[in-house]
Each structure stands twice: as C-alpha cells, then as structure tokens.
Swiss-Prot record:
It catalyses: carbamoyl phosphate + L-aspartate = N-carbamoyl-L-aspartate + phosphate + H(+). Carbamoyl phosphate binds at R48, T49, R98, H125, Q128, A250, P251. Belongs to the aspartate/ornithine carbamoyltransferase superfamily. ATCase family. PROSITE patterns: CARBAMOYLTRANSFERASE. One of its GO terms (cellular component) is cytosol. L-aspartate binds at K76, R158, R208. Pathway: Pyrimidine metabolism; UMP biosynthesis via de novo pathway; (S)-dihydroorotate from bicarbonate: step 2/3. GO terms for molecular function: amino acid binding; aspartate carbamoyltransferase activity. The gene is pyrB. The lineage of its organism: Bacteria, Bacillati, Bacillota, Bacilli, Bacillales. Catalyzes the condensation of carbamoyl phosphate and aspartate to form carbamoyl aspartate and inorganic phosphate, the committed step in the de novo pyrimidine nucleotide biosynthesis pathway. This is Aspartate carbamoyltransferase catalytic subunit. Heterododecamer (2C3:3R2) of six catalytic PyrB chains organized as two trimers (C3), and six regulatory PyrI chains organized as three dimers (R2). GO terms for biological process: 'de novo' pyrimidine nucleobase biosynthetic process; 'de novo' UMP biosynthetic process; amino acid metabolic process.
Amino acid sequence: MKHLHSITELSNDEIMHTIERAIMIKNGEIKRYENIYTANLFFENSTRTKCSFEMAERKLGLQVIPFETSTSSVTKGESLYDTCKTLESIGCDVLVIRHPENNYYEQLHELNIPVVNGGDGSGQHPTQCLLDLMTIYEEYGKFEGLKIIICGDILNSRVARSNYHALTSLGAQVKFVAPEIWQDHSLDAEYVSIDDAIEEVDVCMLLRVQHERHDEDAANFSRVNYNRMYGLTRERYDRLKEEAIILHPAPVNRDVEIDSELVEAPKSRIFKQMENGVYTRMSILSQVIENNR
C-alpha cells in the first residue's frame, strides 16, 4: 500500500494484512517513526475521522502539521493541488484529506507524496471501511458467509459504497435497506425490508441520515416515520440473533437510525469501531510510510 484512495484498490490479501496488522498494533506491537511529517486537510466537518487520524499519527511518533481550511489560502481561491504541493514542498511526507468532491484525489497524481483518503463526497471512505472490517473480524474471525444488512441513506453514503465492495469481495452476503428515494442501483445489491431480514443477520450496519446532502427531501423528512420504517427499534433489536452485532459509522442521529437506549446496548459495537479506528489508521499509515521510503 503506497497510498489509499479507494477500497477497490486493495486486494483481499491487502485488506486482510491491514486488519491483521491493526490487531497486532492493538495488542501492543507499535513501531514508531522519526522525522516523518503529516498534515490532515479536512474540507468537511469531522470529529471521529480527524481526531482518530491525529491520535494514530501521534501514537506512531509522527509530527503533525496543523492545518485549518478556514485560515488557509483555500479561502483566497488556492486550488487543492497547489495547497497539497505547498505542503509537499515544505517537507510533509504524508497527507490525509477529506473533501466534498468525489474522486478529488484524481487531481493529485503529480504529487510526490502519498495521500490517504479520509472520505470523498459520496464516493469512498476506505479507512472507515477497514475499521468496520476489523470490528467484524474480531467478532467472527471470518467474512465468508456472513449475512449483513446496511440500512439507511445508501445513495449518499461513501461508507455503504466502500463496505459493499469490500464485504462482497471477501465473501459476505450484503443486502440493503433504504427508502426508495435513497437507493443506489449502481450497486448490484438486493433491497429488502428490515423486518424481513433482521432475524437472520450477523451484522446490522446502520447509516446516518445525511441531511446536509439532501435538498427538497429534507423538508419532507420525518424522524418518527424513518425510525418506524427503517430504524433499529427495541422491538427489532430483540429479534436479532444472540451473537449479532450492530455497527454505525457515527455521528448517530439518536431515535432516528437507532433508538437512543440501544447505542450502548450489549450488541452495539459503535464505540468499539471508534477505538478500532485508531489502530486501523495506524496500520494504514505505517504501511504507506514504509512503502514510500
């Protein structure tokens, strides 16, 4: 792994290597790096991904260059490429970027330093996908044959897209649950009712309703109706298999995608995902650093 733009760039072996390395790091096998400089360029708001990357970088001994888009020359019209080329020129070794434009990284092929994608529009979120995979693998020790539903705003979700590609490649059976207006038929997955699927799934992955990516739909959105038709309610939770787990990339709209009381219920792994995000990103960054030396 010399960079990470999309989960589709990785073979199954590379995915498994990244997960296994993350588990080793979690168990205390941490290699620290000297004189490696990184910058995190987040052009969309973020709590988990941005802080998780910074924690991963600091645990690896990396020097993190502060960068805030609101006080940078981006506000003066500087292009993404020129911003990144500037950071390369002053000595950054790795860039982590989140950007609202799908496939923004295609503008950056002339850079001589690696880019790790922290999320591009509704395109890809490879590091979130890999931490989700790590969390599933810790529970089941496999992907082959697992039954997984991904519930919510599929059309606007980079998390759904990345997870669908990786999980199906690894042998899991993935189905979607979504209102018709938020379905994405470019992904060759079956759409089902949550009530028809809930009793047989091994993993119930919930997605945030992304109000900021909607227009006229937002005015017609009903939290109560969404929760009733598509959300994980207590009644649905009680129908899950004993060993089933719940995932959510967060932030969580409580009482919309999931009843508030279930966010930290025994089957929930939502905060475990956040913990694993640090180890997964340490695994990714260490591979990128070592493969670009």
